[in-house]
Amino acid sequence: MSSQSLYKVSGNIAANALVNNDKYKTMYQESIVNPEGFWREHGKRIDWIKPYTKIKKTSFDDHNLSINWFYDGTLNASANCLDRHLAEHSDRVAIIWEGDNASEQRKITYGELHAEVCKFANALRSQGVRRGDIVTIYMPMVPEAAVAMLACARIGAVHSVVFGGFSPDSIASRVIDGKSKVIITSDEGMRGGRAIPLKRNIDDALKNPDVTTVEKVIVLKRTGGIVDWVEDRDVWWHSLMETASEYCQPEEMDAEAPLFLLYTSGSTGNPKGVLHTTGGYMVYASMTHEYVFDYKAGEVYWCTADVGWITGHSYMVYGPLANGATVLIHEGVPNHPSPARLGEMIDRHKVSILYTAPTLIRALMAEGKQHFDKFDGSSLRIMGSVGEPINPEAWRWYHEVIGHEHCPIVDTWWQTETGGILITPLPGATDTKPGSATRPFFGVQPALVDNMGNILEGENEGNLVLLDSWPGQMRTVYGDHERFVLTYFKTFRGMYFTGDGARRDEDGYYWITGRVDDVINVSGHRLGTAEVESALVSHELVAEAAVVGYPHDIKGQGIYAYVTLTRGTEETEELRQELRQWVRKEIGALATPDLIQWATGLPKTRSGKIMRRFLRKIAANEVTNLGDASTLADPAVIETLIESRLNRTE
């Protein structure tokens, strides 16, 4: 890596940061050599009802898997985000909210948020929610989404937040798997000037005959839009809040008690319920938020992620609020009604720290930097990137146009499963290289292995694994521990397999190269190819489908589908559009195929396995060096697919 591509930490930033390079090296070394001692100390950053004495009981042996942190302590996550700030910071603003329409704005102090959470926790109890129950949350980006999450945590209920862009079928599958008794939703949400029919989607999901556990649907009135109503099942949020008491004693929870479920795409097609527990997760979310973003008290912090994703959980709700931060929540998209919106909001709310995704940066880049001519940006101090590897061009644009060349960029790598950031620069410690996630956070031991599981030393490329546990790690796949072991610990014995490939350069910096399994990263969100294939094949005119990712200028990866139609079906543009809408309805807008190529046949081995590496290369327009096709049952299929490919650049 040439020195011109190295962005040095400025002396001023290093002098004022929580951690400089020397301190990073000392702390990191201690966290690896003496993890018990390191986490014994740093676990104290949150409040415990019963202090822990036991720190770490972990093993990645697939026959004796164990992940336990602070496991004899007790605490409450909601109390850590609210109650502990009341004595000194009750009047500090916890949430600044800006609606899809900028004229709608609210500020909520820690004292006010505490009262709202207590009231809603009591409201949940009035609807029969008890400790250990799973509550599904399908909400727009409004403060009440955070209130609902924290209220669940307060009474020991387990929340399962479903992204507001998911379809009724996707909601139903998650409700069925989690056996939810109560769903919290809104009449509608607002996004990009459009009303999103959240309540209608819930109604449709609950028509699924396999949904049998739901007793109550609590509905927030957001837009006042007309909704259908089911008596004895549906209840208005505001009606419950009118009579609810303003104090609710937080439940004392074991450190290893479940805090939330969050469903993520897997390569098998069935979304898997990632289970996070309370103690280790809260320690890790709060610590990474403070150190990675170099957070200082009183700063306004804006994470643009939706609450339905892990980034929204860890870095919009639990991490920042545990640290007493002022969090900006935006209901809409930061490039509506114009690309200038992002800059306007940073200036309007004096944002110090911005955490966003490469897909938004690329979208703004495509619109042109003239939209930032009036952008001041002087409040901005730190910028982050999350969701997928950021390409160097987008990194530089972000640095120059949004950061005015003075804000460090923390390009963070982590996963739903990891609970928090694992590989990242620290603003005062790490010289950065555009496109590299750089170095591991404290306590994180990444390694590269070949396909046989042999550790690769030095400058190299391979499968990214982790050699030991960290407090924020998921504990299991809900209801399917065997799948958890199989997915993450069987591929490479004694190691956690991330599913990502990476290379390590001459400076020891990590560069994430993308998924090595059948998962596509669309706009920073993971989609299993099997999930999209299943949706396509469920259409009566589709005989077979194979889905791969391909390079997309805005989204990072687009969805490229190869579809074989039933015999005698005509290949028309109308049918292509019908299939796109079909997938959209089955899964959600995020899963809509960008390109659908008609295929008379797919490249298969004699045993019937589809050889996806050929399909990926054709979709990426890399057709000159496809490699050995001799194992295919019908090698001629490849030529036909190349001839009719849709992603040509010539």
Curated annotation (Swiss-Prot):
Reported cofactor(s): Mg(2+)
Gene: acsA
PANTHER family in alphabetical order: ACETYL-COENZYME A SYNTHETASE
Pfam families: ACAS_N (PF16177), AMP-binding (PF00501), AMP-binding_C (PF13193)
GO biological process: one example: acetyl-CoA biosynthetic process from acetate
PROSITE patterns to which the protein is assigned, alphabetical: AMP_BINDING (PS00455)
Reaction catalysed by this enzyme: acetate + ATP + CoA = acetyl-CoA + AMP + diphosphate
GO cellular-component term (any): cytosol
Entry binding sites for CoA: R191, G192, G193, R194, T311, N335, S523, R584
Protein name: Acetyl-coenzyme A synthetase
Keywords: Acetylation, ATP-binding, Ligase, Magnesium, Metal-binding, Nucleotide-binding
